[in-house]
A protein has these predicted regions:
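Phosphate-bearing ligand-interacting subdomains
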Residues: 31-89, 93
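Hydrophobic, well-ordered beta-alpha structural blocks that scaffold small-molecule cofactor pockets
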Residues: 1-38, 43-51
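Structural signal for interior beta-strand "rungs" in well-ordered beta-sheet cores
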Residues: 86-202
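Alpha-helical elements of the RecA-like P-loop NTPase motor core of helicases
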Residues: 8, 12, 68, 186
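Conserved acidic residues
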Residues: 22, 55-56, 102, 156
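Cofactor-binding loop segments of dinucleotide-utilizing enzymes, especially the Rossmann-like FAD-
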Residues: 3, 26-27, 62, 89, ...
């Protein structure tokens, strides 16, 4: 699903992991064309002709509209019985007792430490790290190089920008936004945006 920058990163992981690619769904591209060597099938309605027992889906949709399209598509096809691949780049590291739901994506250099729980649709981007006992709700996006220290709790849909640091035990509420490079020293409420060092609500 998708044909933007995030989709290219997902495509790279799929190829490194040896998956057989049927094609991509991307309404902005003409059906029957090629995208980075992959067949363009059309928009997501082409899945109506494919049994959920025959295919796995990979979510390459990025964060346009704060990721709402990404969430809507993933949740809709989950509810119809389709499975979303959990993708782990070969250079990512995760502890054996960490738990990943379907549809989680660990990109190159990502680290997930012991006791972590990552719910469906979470993205841990390039070289980001999630330390021990963190809990990340559905569709949380951790940007490149961000650091979550131990026992951080992040609710559904929150966004943590590139290079941000979240100190131990902090709670980020649903749909909270943490700006790039922010240092979060206190909890951030649902729907709030925090930026700066130390991070303050904007």
């Amino acid at each position: 699903m998708g044909a933007g920058g995030h989709a290219r990163v997902v495509l790279d992981v799929l190829r490194l992991r040896g998956y057989q690619l049927l094609g991509i769904c991307a309404p902005e591209l003409p059906a029957g064309s090629k995208w980075h060597g992959v067949d363009v099938l059309g928009d997501d309605t082409v899945l109506d002709d494919l049994s959920c027992d025959e295919v796995w889906l990979a979510n390459g949709i990025g964060l346009a509209q704060r990721g709402m399209v990404r969430r809507r598509i993933q949740d809709a096809y989950f509810s119809r019985g389709y499975s979303w691949l959990t993708l782990e780049h070969p250079s990512s590291l995760r502890a054996s007792d960490s738990w990943l739901a379907d549809g989680v994506q660990l990109m190159a250099g990502a680290v997930v430490q012991p006791g972590c729980r990552l719910e469906s649709g979470v993205v841990i981007n390039t070289c980001a790290s999630v330390d021990h006992d963190c809990q990340l709700g559905e569709h949380v996006f951790v940007g490149p190089g961000a650091v979550l220290c131990g026992a951080v709790k992040v609710d559904r849909g929150a966004f943590i920008g590139a290079g941000a640091v979240v100190l131990p035990g902090i709670h980020l509420g649903e749909d909270a936004i943490i700006g790039a490079g922010a240092v979060v020293i206190r909890s951030v409420g649902a729907g709030c945006t925090a930026v700066g060092n130390p991070a303050r609500n904007r």
